Structure formats: C-alpha cells, structure tokens
Amino acid sequence: MKAAELRKLSIDELKDKLAETRKELFDLRFKHATAQLEKTAEIPAAKHNVARILTILKEKGA
C-alpha cells in the first residue's frame, strides 16, 4: 500500500492495518523457514509496509 493511501486512513484503521501486516510478515517468515515461500521478495516488502504504517502513525501523533 502506498503512503498516500495510508495517510487517508484513521488512526484506528492504521493500527488494524499494522496488526494485519505484522501477521502477514510472521506468516511469510514461517513459510520461508519451512521452504514453502517461492517469492522471497515479499518479506522485505512486508517490512517496508510495517515501517510505512509506523511512520504515518508517528506523524499523526498516535
């Protein structure tokens, strides 16, 4: 998700999105560890999404 799209969300929606993205990252890491993940580039992409969400939450003062 792009930063501009994330900035339009409310603080509660961002927190929900953060939890969802962190769970996705956990699942990706688990799949990678068990050799079930084919697209390993999804892990850094999920990390970047977490960082984007955290940055926007800090900008909004949450």
UniProtKB/Swiss-Prot annotation:
GO cellular component: a single term: cytosolic large ribosomal subunit
Keyword Ribosomal protein in record: yes
GO biological process, one term: translation
UniProt keyword Ribosomal protein, yes or no: yes
Keywords: Ribonucleoprotein, Ribosomal protein
Molecular function as annotated in GO: structural constituent of ribosome
Domain of life: Bacteria
Family: Belongs to the universal ribosomal protein uL29 family.
Protein name: Large ribosomal subunit protein uL29
